[in-house]
């Protein structure tokens, strides 16, 4: 995800020098590619608690790794199919022919990138479950570096070599995904618990793959719900005027950047919960997740504080429009509160992942974000962006309550071990 995000940002910047139709074709494809990759990554997070449960047992761990690869193949192919269908989606949606004519092979390159990224996510999810976050970071940084270097070179060209334009962007992002996946799989093969063991997918164990999907697919559905509702919010902001639309878009980007810290902390709690889960130690499970919530809160507050202090130079990187900057500055306190609540709900959501019970998260998202989607347009029409972000804050606050309540109740079912409950 880090490599694809960095690649998308760089490609957007460099394609701005090309024809407007080219940038529009890029945006159209990314509108499908981004939720597709995020959904696949969400589905593969279901692998994490299963690998964490066997972090010291190679004989039990190896089949889980292979099952994760089969889940990656299945979800990756579905995501790739969606991205490859961008020309048909655009045609059915009434996208101008000029934009569609610029697509060329780009959707097919990005479809391949979805499948490659899925295989990489299978490895990184396994590494997270094993508590090897440094290897995950190394894989992400390798892909990011490749995207940052290759994107401008392949799109605009280097020296006497002509750029490839939009196909160059696709090649760069596919290469970055391949490098990230290769580094992740290399790191996985070097883990002591899997040393000298064949890590190919082997023969699929359908029931075991379905068990992984039972945890991962509700997570994928929550990702789709979140993307869909954020799209509704973007439309609500765009109905005001272009300045408010830009301010909203940049504010969402800022929340996404800060939110990555909460995701990292939330994922890191899963291997910490695993030993308590094995022992059916309810208190230990809850303590580990609460510690993750406190850590995520601290990380988000730290990054948010830096953002608040450096708000002027940071915003100048996103826009030179004074009106848009003023609007973002006015929203900044709300933006930071939204990130804090989003971070807390995410950690409790990962707590549910750790105990392999993710359907409650899906229900919480469906209710809270469903209400937000219904209220977004009328609230924005009456109160502008402030009302919109207050509504988002309210939805996230309800999510915190819902996720925490579900986690507390579902973790209580793990078993009673004397004084180990609270």
Question: Where are the regions that the model predicts?
Answer:
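Transmembrane helix-bundle signature of multi-pass secondary active exporters and lipid flippases
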Residues: 1-45, 49, 113-114, 210, ...
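Membrane-helix interface/capping residues of multi-pass secondary transporters
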Residues: 12, 20-23, 133, 166, ...
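Helix-loop interface residues and adjacent transmembrane-helix termini in multi-pass membrane transporters
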Residues: 17-20, 54, 129-130, 160-163, ...
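Short alpha-helical transmembrane segments in multi-pass integral membrane proteins
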Residues: 51-115, 146-153, 161-217, 273-338, ...
């Amino acid at each position: 995800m880090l490599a694809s995000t960095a690649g998308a940002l760089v490609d957007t910047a460099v394609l701005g020098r090309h024809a407007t139709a080219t940038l529009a074709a890029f945006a159209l494809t990314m509108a499908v590619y981004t939720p597709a990759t995020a959904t696949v990554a969400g589905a593969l997070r279901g692998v994490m608690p299963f690998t964490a449960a066997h972090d010291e047992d190679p004989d039990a761990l190896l089949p889980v790794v292979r099952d994760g690869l089969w889940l990656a193949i299945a979800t990756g192919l579905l995501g790739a199919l969606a991205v490859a269908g961008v020309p048909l989606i655009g045609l059915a949606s009434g996208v101008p022919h000029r934009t569609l004519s610029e697509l060329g092979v780009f959707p097919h390159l990005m479809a391949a990138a979805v499948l490659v990224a899925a295989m990489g996510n299978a490895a990184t999810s396994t590494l997270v479950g094993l508590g090897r976050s440094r290897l995950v970071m190394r894989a992400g940084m390798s892909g990011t570096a490749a995207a940052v270097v290759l994107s401008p070179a392949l799109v605009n060209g280097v020296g006497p070599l002509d750029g490839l334009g939009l196909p160059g962007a696709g090649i760069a992002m596919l290469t970055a995904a391949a490098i990230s996946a290769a580094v992740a799989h290399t790191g996985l093969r070097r883990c002591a618990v899997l040393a000298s063991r064949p890590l190919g997918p082997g023969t699929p164990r359908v029931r075991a793959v379905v068990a992984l999907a039972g945890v991962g697919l509700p997570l994928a559905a929550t990702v789709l719900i979140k993307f869909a509702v954020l799209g509704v919010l973007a439309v609500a902001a765009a109905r005001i005027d272009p300045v408010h639309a830009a301010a909203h878009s940049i504010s969402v980007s800022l929340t996404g950047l800060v939110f990555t810290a909460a995701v990292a902390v939330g994922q890191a709690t899963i291997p910490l919960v695993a030993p308590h889960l094995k022992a059916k130690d309810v208190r230990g499970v809850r303590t580990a997740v609460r510690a993750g919530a406190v850590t995520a809160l601290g990380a988000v507050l730290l990054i948010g504080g830096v953002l608040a202090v450096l708000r002027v130079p940071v915003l100048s990187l996103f826009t030179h429009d004074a009106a848009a900057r003023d609007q973002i500055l006015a929203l900044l306190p709300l933006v930071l509160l939204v990130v804090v609540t989003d971070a807390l709900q995410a950690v409790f959501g990962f707590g549910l992942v750790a105990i392999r019970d993710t359907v409650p998260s899906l229900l919480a998202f469906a209710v809270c974000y469903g209400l937000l989607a219904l209220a977004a347009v009328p609230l924005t029409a009456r109160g502008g962006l402030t009302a919109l972000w207050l509504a988002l804050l309210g939805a996230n606050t309800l999510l915190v309550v819902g996720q925490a309540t579900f986690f507390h109740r579902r973790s209580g079912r793990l078993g009673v071990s004397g004084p180990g409950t609270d």
